[in-house]
């Protein structure tokens, strides 16, 4: 045993001697500069210039690649080559390698194709490869796979001619002139190429006015409904400016803040949305318009794994889409800093306040490090802007321009609206008749009021042999995304939904919206029927009405008259008997749909004319300049106290089937 121990000891001595920790005369080309320096075995007997240990960068580096990662202190692989180019590197080979960037947010079922090398370690490829030195306005090489993924959906069947009749108002000092074509304003090579890939032929009304306003760096409050193209209206000019200006101080602050995944991210643009579905939708649009650029969009929202979202942020974030609650969480965790946020967008602003997000919004905008108004550029978009919310906008916007765009669908008559008296007990059988008449392959969206009602109706339709699915707030994020995927793809052409899907979801080719249960306020009705007839396409909206819905009689009547829709005689009689009390139909001073707009600029006096851009359709027999200026606020049911529920049972079933227009 002792003999073996002696041999082992000798063997170890020989091995340590081979390491030669104290002498490097025979290594590194005999350089005296390296005397006393430990040389790893795999780098011995090489020239000094091949590799060295840099005390300043705290890591092994190669001289030729030192510039690429000097700020990161990264180490090279065994060939002296930066790990940026290694299969196991912490960053991708570039933004458009063969793995692409398919799933930055980790949502959906494609999470295995992340696009950041085989082993993701929080690498930040677009922010570290000299991205502060490169020209951000120049497009990166194309990726056929990513291009197919982002743009294969296409925009088919768009009826832009219908948009010509939509009225538009712009009020404010020195309003920039609107454009007629995307080429009328300089947005750069990247944006114009992506516009061509999305097959946008010409801007929608809200884009015609909003794009030049934002390009002029003016604050904007736009009253425009979802489906009008408002998402692109703010993404296009914001991204164009980022490409033109570059990352600026945000990149330097990110590098100085920490190393690798511990870095706080400083987005250049922030978009706030009320729901996770709308946030994901905006993020997907941002991915399209940031294709072939160095801008990396990210999305964070509640109801999903925060760890995955943090890992996604750690790879870099220039444009952030977020729900208010989750963003506050990220800020308190030290993952997001708003010090260099140049562009702030509040999408569906009325909905966010309605959902109680005002404290979080004020926390984000006013009580943190976000630049003040006048320094940052702020945009608010929504389908309606009551006077109370316009007054609130004074705290966020500086010398803003108010843009009111007529409601897409109702004003342009793209959506045929039908209101049918159906007793509560007859709704299911009537729904089956509608589904049979619509056709099996047509996408049909059925709205109900409660989560329990959604599950019950889905179960009923399933047992009746219909391919259907449902979505509501109690479903997990994965279940909701899967339901939307099944619906969009046509595998389940019937989607039963609560109000969670009514706001902002961009589901193309929905042919029929059915209000199985009418909402309690007219704004929710406008959003629901806006799921069909989107972006100029034609659609049909059918609503089941009975004594439970008397509270919206007046507003529903006003909306149908304005949109030049057929008004059932029983609805006129009901509105006359229970609310108007002798005043002529449609002349209520409190009409919230005055002139075809969801709201008007409260800064304009009630007698002043503020219409700079309008069509003949904007004129109306109804008067009143308040738009949605009543003091009722949100929640609906404002007129519920004026009505009782008796006297209407079954007296209006004589409509037959000709309501469908056949």
Swiss-Prot record:
Residue numbers bearing the Omega-N-methylarginine modification: 101, 110, 592, 617, 632
Region Disordered: start-end pairs: 19-144, 601-634
Gene Ontology MF terms in the entry: ATP binding; ATP hydrolysis activity; cadherin binding; CTPase activity; DNA binding; DNA helicase activity; eukaryotic initiation factor 4E binding; gamma-tubulin binding
SUPFAM superfamilies reported for this sequence: P-loop containing nucleoside triphosphate hydrolases
Effect of residue 230 to A: No effect on general translation
Biased composition (Low complexity): 70-89, 604-622
Effect of residue 528 to H: In medulloblastoma; somatic mutation; loss of ATPase activity; interacts with CSNK1E, even in the presence of dsRNA; contrary to wild-type protein, strongly interacts with CSNK1A1 and CSNK1D in vivo; strongly increased ability to activate CSNK1E kinase activity, leading to increased DVL phosphorylation, thereby activating Wnt/beta-catenin signaling; no effect on RNA-binding, nor on subcellular location
UniProt short sequence motif Nuclear export signal, positions renumbered to this chain: 12-21
Chain ranges for the short sequence motif Q motif as given in the UniProt record: 180-208
Record-listed ATP binding positions: 200-207, 224-231
Region (Interaction with HCV core protein): 409-662
Catalysed reactions listed for this entry: ATP + H2O = ADP + phosphate + H(+)
Domain Helicase C-terminal: 414-575
Sequence segments annotated as region (Required for TBK1 and IKBKE-dependent IFNB1 activation): 2-139
GO cellular component entries: cell leading edge; centrosome; cytoplasm; cytoplasmic stress granule; cytosol; extracellular exosome; extracellular region; ficolin-1-rich granule lumen
Domain Helicase ATP-binding stretches: 211-403
Annotated positions of the Phosphotyrosine modification: 104
Alphabetized InterPro entries for the sequence: DEAD/DEAH_box_helicase_dom, Helicase_ATP-bd, Helicase_C-like, P-loop_NTPase, RNA-helicase_DEAD-box_CS, RNA_helicase_DEAD_Q_motif
Location relative to the cell: Cell membrane; Nucleus; Cytoplasm; Cytoplasm, Stress granule
Biased composition regions of type Basic and acidic residues, renumbered to the chain: 44-68, 94-130
Enzymatic class: hydrolase
UniProt miscellaneous comment: Encoded by an chromosome X-linked gene which may escape X chromosome inactivation in females. DDX3Y, its homolog on chromosome Y, is located on the Y non-recombinant portion.
Function: Multifunctional ATP-dependent RNA helicase. The ATPase activity can be stimulated by various ribo-and deoxynucleic acids indicative for a relaxed substrate specificity. In vitro can unwind partially double-stranded DNA with a preference for 5'-single-stranded DNA overhangs. Binds RNA G-quadruplex (rG4s) structures, including those located in the 5'-UTR of NRAS mRNA. Involved in many cellular processes, which do not necessarily require its ATPase/helicase catalytic activities. Involved in transcription regulation. (Microbial infection) Facilitates hepatitis C virus (HCV) replication. During infection, HCV core protein inhibits the interaction between MAVS and DDX3X and therefore impairs MAVS-dependent INFB induction and might recruit DDX3X to HCV replication complex.
Identification of the protein by name: ATP-dependent RNA helicase DDX3X
